[in-house]
Amino acid sequence: LVGEATYSSAIINAVELMPIFEFDENMNARTVNGKRLLEYWGYNSVNFFSPNTSYASKPEHNCEGTELKELIRELHENGIEVILDVVFNHTAEGNELGKTFCFKGFDNKVYYMLTPEGNYYNFSGCGNTLNCNHPIVRQMILECLRYWTINYRVDGFRFDLASILGRHEDGSPLNNPPLLELLAYDPVLRNVKLIAEAWDAGGLYQVGSFPASRRWAEWNGRYRDCLRSFLKGDFWNAWDAAWSISGSGDLYGGFYSDHNDNYAGYNSCVNFLTCHDGFTMYDLYSYNEKHNEANGWNNTDGSNDNRSWNCGEEGDSTNPEVLSLRFRMIRNACAVLMSSRGTPMFLAGDEFGNTKHGNNNTYCQDNETSWINWKLLEKNHDLFEFFKFMIRF
């Protein structure tokens, strides 16, 4: 732990952890080619107030909580902030056919958005939608964030499918969502970073129009899509690329924006090319197509809109010219990302060429496909040094 924290402090000042709340690992569990596949990413919460017990190193009472606090303390001592990815848009209870863990039994009509016929609205794409702006649910979310801030001393939260947090109980988008304003102005959370994934699975896309109250930042999905296309040679969108590199001022505070007063300028913009969803940066320049066969869905899962380029050969290669071009493209991407106005974010392992071998949806791959291959740090040390240089630039 100490070694990895010291390594990380050499290049970053914050780490965003994927969901660490207790979740249902057995949801949609199945066997594919002799391998047992479980929910790995953690986006099916069961309890918002407890860390996932399976992350503990020993089967001891509250070992997971103690070790998480030790991790956060160690990261803080190395100058690294900790941001939690939180999932308040749905739970692991699913739709009418799903399990009952908690909220269905407490008060189904209060905690979930229901149609007039009593069915579950599915703005999350996961079977149900948390009724975030109901007063009781609103208070629960606030108390949860306060709990993690006070007891675990986390520095920020990234909200998965955050546009759901701005929907009315009937599912319609609100102009001034009570929950978002409550979190923005809460005194306990005043120094905590709030980061939105400003869209949902119901078609609500709010990048540049999220109800931010000059307090929220957001993942800039437009930056990702635009720069991925531009970097692989789609020069027709050079104008949009220039806007994105210069800070997306048309969205977050600059020319031609109708939402300037809503955002806190360029600090509201989190630029990224890669995250847990989709290709790693190495795979972005090693594959033209996704290769998700190991997930067991005949390669139908995961996005087809990857905006990637394999540099002349699909997948693994021993061709020195192809490999040289791939690492040049990664350096190009890193240079653009670190030079863009806003806050840069990249996927752990990108700094030394980690690969998922073309799988762009590793939600069920708790194995070498998803695990970071630390041996690549030594093999691709020149790339790591380039990342360090650009971050300090």
What would you call each of these model-derived segments?
Residues 1-154, 161-188, 204, 254, ...:
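Substrate-binding/active-site clefts of carbohydrate-active enzymes
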Residues 17, 276, 390:
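A residue-level signal for conserved active-site and pocket-lining positions in enzyme catalytic cores
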Residues 69, 142-145, 327-338, 387:
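Short, hydrophobic/amphipathic alpha-helical packing segments
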Residues 88, 353-354:
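Short active-site segment of divalent metal-dependent hydrolases/proteases
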Residues 153, 169-170, 174-348, 352-353, ...:
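Conserved alpha/beta catalytic core and glycan-binding cleft of carbohydrate-active enzymes
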Residues 318-322, 373-379:
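Short histidine-centered catalytic/ligand-binding loop motif
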Residues 363-374:
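Acyl/amide activation-and-transfer machinery of modular secondary-metabolite enzymes
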Residues 379-393:
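Catalytic cores of secreted or luminal carbohydrate-active enzymes
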